[in-house]
Amino acid sequence: MSAPISTIAEIGKHEGQAVTVRGWLYNLRESGKLLFPQFRDGSGVIQGVVPKNAVPPEVFDAIKGLTQESSVIVEGKVRADKRAPGGFELDVSNVQVVQRVSESDPYPITPKEHGTDFLMEHRHLWLRSLRQAAILRVRAEIIRAARDFFDSNGFTLTDPPIITPAACEGTSTLFPVDYFDEEAFLTQSGQLYIEATAMALGKVYSFGPTFRAEKSKTRRHLTEFWMVEPEVAYGTLDDIMELAEGLLTFLVKRCLERRRADLQTIGRDVTKLEKIEAPFPRITYDEAVQKLQEGHAQGALENKFEYGGDLGSPDETYLSSQYDKPVMVNRYPASVKAFYMEPDPQRPELALCVDVLAPEGYGEIIGGSQRMASHEQLLKRIHDHNLPEEAFRWYLDLRKYGSVPHSGFGMGIERAVAWICGLEHVRETIPFPRMLHRLYP
């Protein structure tokens, strides 16, 4: 194989030239003396054309004998064809079979309908499908875009620990770890730690895995997921709502610019994403409750929402389906939110917090707040929540030595991917999802 190597994604740069493509057989169709193999290489799929009278017999026979997912190196001339996916085809002239999948043990995910349990059990192979590969490329783009957004806006990436000391927010949804005979837990959030780095660096963000031992089986829950969490010294609730608005519009725009073809492969209606631009609607918790109670009265919600409760998945789904942009629900009752949130000075029973609900019924993808700045108030809140003061001694120190107003939020990568890709379930948003009853593969 003497022709230069090209990825399928960049094959259009070589129109009229011979190239080498390294990948796998995705599909093979035969029509008389013509073979139409489809090759994939991770960057895309291209159709090859193999006329029997145009290649040596051994090349034709080798391609004809290929089985699904056999690994191959093919050489051919790139030809433009508007009818072809991607706009190009490959006139194959040579092939090297790296490994032929055995017919006695064929590739298990054949081109037919398979149940979800079967596909999840074979997740390591399901990733090779066009749809799953497209989702993972969109995921990578979202992560890259989030980093670019914060890096270009003066934020410093800081890395909080994944193993944390005992009982930071209660242990009911934490995964315990035996840490050299000390009790420790896998992190639920890097927030407390990046509050500390924000006091050192001003504007910071973290990106990493988080773990929640919640026995939830909803389409929105994973036990292991990834979050991007910014924190801003001297930042207010309004500041982070504006920041969240900027981040989400940036992510959507980037995916439309760079991953439109992948979104179309997934079947996403991109016209809905094209509507995502600032400003986003903002409603208070009180206004949200009114909308939910009206929805119940109209028969759209089964249960009547009672004031003072936190929003559940059906409530978020209903509210977010009322808008074609993300909606920012702010100022929840402090009693249903985390202990560290600053109270609203106008109504101290409310917290200066926000949940950003993605449209089309996708619900919460961002949660954030202004953090409590007073040492005395924070200490009281820790006691009120029956949390161990000693575990938070370092966190309380942040309020003793130059405390300032500060704010931040967390965005779940998987929920953002689900929304932008238009997916029904978050299990498709990460290569190997961890769920209540899913630890393999």
PLM features: what roles do these ranges have?
Residues D262-E277:
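Short, highly charged C-terminal tails/helix-capping segments
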Residues S2-A233, A418:
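Class II aminoacyl-tRNA synthetase-like tRNA-binding/catalytic domains
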Residues E58-D61, A261, Q290:
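Polar/charged alpha-helical tracts
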Residues L157-D159, L263-Q264, V329:
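Cytochrome P450 heme-thiolate monooxygenase catalytic core
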Residues T173-K253, K275-P441:
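A translation/RNA-centric and nucleic-acid-associated enzymatic feature enriched
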Residues F250-Q264:
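Flexible helix-coil linker/hinge segments at domain or subdomain boundaries
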Residues A140, R144, P161, G267, ...:
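An alpha-helix initiation/capping motif
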